[in-house]
From Swiss-Prot:
Full protein name: Phosphoglucosamine mutase
Key words of the record: Isomerase, Magnesium, Metal-binding, Phosphoprotein
Source taxonomy: Bacteria, Pseudomonadati, Pseudomonadota, Betaproteobacteria, Burkholderiales
Residues annotated as the enzyme's active site: 108
Binding site for Mg(2+): 108, 247, 249, 251
A biological-process GO annotation: carbohydrate metabolic process
Cofactor(s) in the UniProt record: Mg(2+)
Amino acid sequence: MARRYFGTDGIRGKVGDPPITPDFVLRLGYAAGKVLAGADTWAKTGSRPTVLIGKDTRVSGYMLEAALESGFSAAGVDVMLAGPMPTPGVAYLTRALRLAAGVVISASHNPYYDNGIKFFSADGNKLPDEVESQIEEQLDKPLECAPSERLGKARRLDDAAGRYIEFCKGTFPQAFDLRGMKLVVDCAHGAAYDVAPHVFHELGADVITIGVSPNGFNINDGVGATAPDALVRAVRANKADLGVALDGDADRLQIVDANGRLYNGDELLYVLVQDRIATQGKVDGAVGTLMTNMAVEVALKNKGVQFVRAAVGDRYVLEKLREHGWELGAEGSGHILSLDRHSTGDGIVSALLVLAAMQRSGRSLEQLLEGVTLFPQKLINVRMQPGADWKGNDAIRRAINEAEGALDGSGRVLIRASGTEPVLRVMVEAAHEKDAVHHAERIATVVKQATS
């Protein structure tokens, strides 16, 4: 059964438009609370479950936090409020505090006028599809407030930020520190604006910050992992050794070196796999996505590392990692999973893992990626009407077939619907940039004509 509200990363949309409205989010909190309260762990003991709510810095977070809190309380679920907190911080604290679930109010890399809700299970993982389906089923039932003696209570979690800072630092090798390194940290005016600079500073780095002055409206606005030009300029202007850019909820990153070169998630995955081979002797396999650059796949296979592609979305990378019993996976967008360190993608932890790999090897990122030249990719986002039947369109199919025939095995064509926005993503990868651009633009033109 198709889900009505949950996408690849929770529920997301424009604030004020269904489903991101206070009345719906209150009912969502109630529905999630009823599902949690009915779970075996809590139903058998009769204990009242507790959930943790964190958020990013969007002005709408206050409204949605209050709505969620009310819904959970009406379902008889206690609430702990973490305030502004990176998504991976909520996942960690949920697991560390043995809570029933964690909830994040964020639209990640989207503009301030969007927002969303995503859930984490007690073990710090994103909720399975079947639990999200149970919540959707509960949404169809009437809201029946728990008796007064069973209503949930709410309280602030003291030092949530400090607890998460210590967790992040604990993932960095005790033998290393960052003394002598000048580091620019771009927090996208988002959830990590306070914690990320502290992590790198307390490990010894000379930290220069940008994107650390949230006002409720400037999250991801010209800064952060989706706008890395700001980081490139800051690294060059300050003659820094390296720059790290996080997105609005800090679950992904981009890294820039002293020369202004940008490194994406595909390249950083290769660096981390190399580091594991050097320290452990062997890495059985790694997981990317349908969008992962072919050059990385070839380079990993040349090192004897099996490579598997998952559907786009970090939850699907995680599923493949668990299926194969592996630890390392990534998306080119900068979501990096290292399951021996954390249960979910964490931009701060991922940056520390890359820095540790550089220190262990004594080499720069450019040197660690010698011999790995990414194939040119052209990605075009085409807005379309929700529900448009692009898969069954003959004109689109012909355009794809013609491009694949012209590439003749020296590239790839990938078209997919976004799980978070009403757009169709057209990606072409080729040995030569002009070919990637030509075929992507041609297919995108056909898609626009067919879906408008």
